[in-house]
Amino acid sequence: MRIAIIGSGIAGLASAWWLHGEHEVTLFEANDYLGGHTHTHDVQVGGRRMAVDTGFIVFNPRHYPLLTALFDELGVASQPTTMSFSMHSERSGVEYNATSLDGLFCQRRNLLSPRFWGMLADLRRFYRDAQLLLAEDQGPTLGQYLRDQRYGEAFIEEHLLPMASALWSSPTATVMDFPARYLAQFMANHQMLQMTGRSTWRVVKGGSARYVEALRARWQVRERLECPVHSVERTPWGARVHSAAGVEGFDEVILACHSDQALALLGDADAIEREVLGAIRYQPNEAVLHTDASLLPRDRKAWAAWNAHVPRDPAAPCTVSYCMNLLQGLPGDTPLVVTLNRSEAIEPAKVLRTLRYAHPVHDHAAVRAQQRWGELQGRRHTWFAGAYWGWGFHEDGIRSAHRVIDALRACEPHRLAPAFGEVAA
């Protein structure tokens, strides 16, 4: 069959990899690179040339089994990393690194702070009690749960919300609307509701784009870079893809782009597609790669892989800065930092790259829509893959592709109509 895949994030890449040996696959990508959030930049800092990631960074074999299997199949090398977390609050002046006692109490005054000890007590209580949320079908939003259980302001504003905002690249107000069960389930699955026995995380050696290079070196796929798709027109026999390259006919089309992008491409979207895809929103985020150390905690003992920042204005969202030297094991004294949504604080002369990404919003409407995955797949020769079907991470993207490929293969005997030829160039 002739199969079009629209979008080259992990869902599109994995779909193309699993199909290219059996079918004629065309991969459409609007950007000038393949990978989506797999985005590695070659930069020169301090006389050294380094590959720095600004999107997908970390994985671990236990919680990313499909991604790990793909890396093993491709011979992609990886190395262990740290997932240390720090927080600096402009409101309270509190700063800590949760990785060690020395980092936790880098501000020695916190040893005598009832507020700080209350935060730690609430942290232990949350680890224990959040397990009970896993038994609830729907349950409250995170904000409702925290209020009902009377968690302290310090725990909410100086630990849980900054951490969750960093994990999902989402504003704190959005995080408070997440289903509490959803957050607890993610944390439990990733061993984050425990003090010890957590997984070892890893990064791809030389930058995450190395796995994209490995795929491209091995597959037989028609790649359409810098070729935005304008619309997808379904017919009884397949689908026509209208792109910058013209109009082409395919037997099947896999929309491996964001849910809102997929819906925008379907001019003939039906009620089910509008309901499900329309319920999963995306949040835009600006990522800046830079060398400005002022975006990291003031005390170097508090520097961590993930550094959350709580602004003075209570209405302003938390932001996060990733120390890529720690995450990727990059050499040199100059910090290489990726900061989300705080470009105004970065010294312009120290900016290396400015990128724009988008991440799914996991509110109750989105979680309900995820349960309707099967209602969309394969109807009118159209399939939907993307990390938005899960928690929004790389493993969710590749898992969604795996589900689509399994379903597509199961119905192949019924899809015997001839493919369209090329309509226009």
Where are the predicted features?
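N-terminal glycine-rich dinucleotide-binding loop that anchors FAD/FMN and/or NAD(P) in oxidoreductases
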Residues: 41-67
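Glycine-rich FAD pyrophosphate-binding loop
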Residues: 20-44
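Conserved flavin/dinucleotide-binding core of flavoenzymes
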Residues: 42, 99-102, 316-425
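Helical element adjacent to the flavin cofactor pocket in flavoenzyme catalytic cores
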Residues: 185-243, 248-251
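Mid-domain catalytic core of redox enzymes
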Residues: 228-360
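Conserved Rossmann-like nucleotide-cofactor binding loop
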Residues: 11, 33, 260
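Mobile amphipathic helical/loop "lid" adjacent to a hydrophobic cofactor/ligand pocket
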Residues: 61-180, 184-185
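N-terminal Rossmann-like FAD-binding beta1-loop-alpha1 element of flavoenzymes
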Residues: 2-27
